[in-house]
Structures are given as C-alpha cells and as structure tokens.
Amino acid sequence: MARPAPWWWLRPLAALALALALVRVPSARAGQMPRPAERGPPVRLFTEEELARYSGEEEDQPIYLAVKGVVFDVTSGKEFYGRGAPYNALAGKDSSRGVAKMSLDPADLTHDISGLTAKELEALDDIFSKVYKAKYPIVGYTARRILNEDGSPNLDFKPEDQPHFDIKDEF
C-alpha cells in the first residue's frame, strides 16, 4: 500500500480556507457588490485669502482656523471663535505663532514659528494635539503647508489623520 503524500493534511485546510473566502465575498450576481470604505468629507487646499473668508464675521459661514498649516472647522466653538468672541482673532488665518505664545497680539497671528523657544514649540504641539485635533474636524490644509514658496510640492507633507486625503485631488 502506498503511503499518502506528506502534505495530505493540507488539503482539508485549503478546502476550509476556500470555503470561508467564498462565504465572505458577496455575490455580484445577487447585486451585493462590496461597498468602498466610507470617506469623510473631502479636505481641501486653502490660500490665505480663502481662509480669511471663514473668520467668523459672517453669521452663515463656518469658522475655520489653521494651526501648523492644518485647517480646522471650529464652528462648534462659536462662543470662543465667532464674531466678538475672545479668540476670534485666531480665526480665518494660520495663527500658529499666536497659539504657541498664547498671544492675541496681531504681530503674533501668523504661521511663522521661526524664533520660538523650545517651550513655545512644545506648547504649540501640545495645543495642536490635545485641543484642535482632539476637538475639531480637519477640513483642509494651507497652501503653505503643501507647497513650497516656489509653488513646487512639499515632499515632506504628511496629512494629519486624513487617510482619504489625496493631494492630486487639489491640482
């Protein structure tokens, strides 16, 4: 009598794996095509001029602000960022320096973080993560974050918590 091949025990496992795969794949004939993963609202690229339109001055507009080049919809915090609110000066622009220094001085309401101390940079990262990213949806990025000064793509750009962001959608 011939001995079975040493891999004979793999056949039942392969059959089981095939059966499980067939059960998990919906039948196209039954009209059950797999649905693509749900995508959040698309993010977009904002110029400084476009971002300025969302400063909280218009009642029917959302309120956006940017920190570290990431644009957040802070409309749910209208009492903080809306017209006449205590932090309205931060809205409608990238105010990274002001956030880092905890300053509302007009000279600090800029994206420029050059010259900040290590403590201020740490505060910026902390507020960025624990306040803005934790509380408010990301709606886009500033052009400055995605593009270099000469208009070429910033090869170091990495989206923040937006796996559905595709830079080619912006061009």
UniProtKB/Swiss-Prot annotation:
It holds the Pfam family Cyt-b5. Residues 43-128 form the Cytochrome b5 heme-binding domain. InterPro entries: Cyt_B5-like_heme/steroid-bd (IPR001199), Cyt_B5-like_heme/steroid_sf (IPR036400), MAPR/NEUFC/NENF-like (IPR050577). Interacts with PINK1 and PARK7. The modification N6-acetyllysine is found at residue 135. Residues 151-171 are annotated as: Disordered. One of its GO terms (cellular component) is extracellular space. The cytochrome b5 heme-binding domain was proven to bind heme, although it lacks the conserved iron-binding His residue at position 81. The keyword Hydrolase does not apply. SMART domains: Cyt-b5 (SM01117). Residues 157-171 have a biased composition (Basic and acidic residues). It comes from the Eukaryota. Residues 1-30 form the signal peptide. Non-classical progesterone receptors involved in extranuclear signaling are classified in 2 groups: the class II progestin and adipoQ receptor (PAQR) family (also called mPRs) (PAQR5, PAQR6, PAQR7, PAQR8 and PAQR9) and the b5-like heme/steroid-binding protein family (also called MAPRs) (PGRMC1, PGRMC2, NENF and CYB5D2). Belongs to the cytochrome b5 family. MAPR subfamily. One of its GO terms (biological process) is MAPK cascade. This is Neudesin. Keywords: Acetylation, Endoplasmic reticulum, Heme, Iron, Metal-binding, Mitochondrion, Secreted, Signal. It is found in: Secreted, Extracellular space; Mitochondrion; Endoplasmic reticulum. Acts as a neurotrophic factor in postnatal mature neurons enhancing neuronal survival. Promotes cell proliferation and neurogenesis in undifferentiated neural progenitor cells at the embryonic stage and inhibits differentiation of astrocytes. Its neurotrophic activity is exerted via MAPK1/ERK2, MAPK3/ERK1 and AKT1/AKT pathways. Neurotrophic activity is enhanced by binding to heme. Also acts as an anorexigenic neurotrophic factor that contributes to energy balance. One of its GO terms (molecular function) is metal ion binding. Its main location: secreted. Gene3D superfamilies: Cytochrome b5-like heme/steroid binding domain.
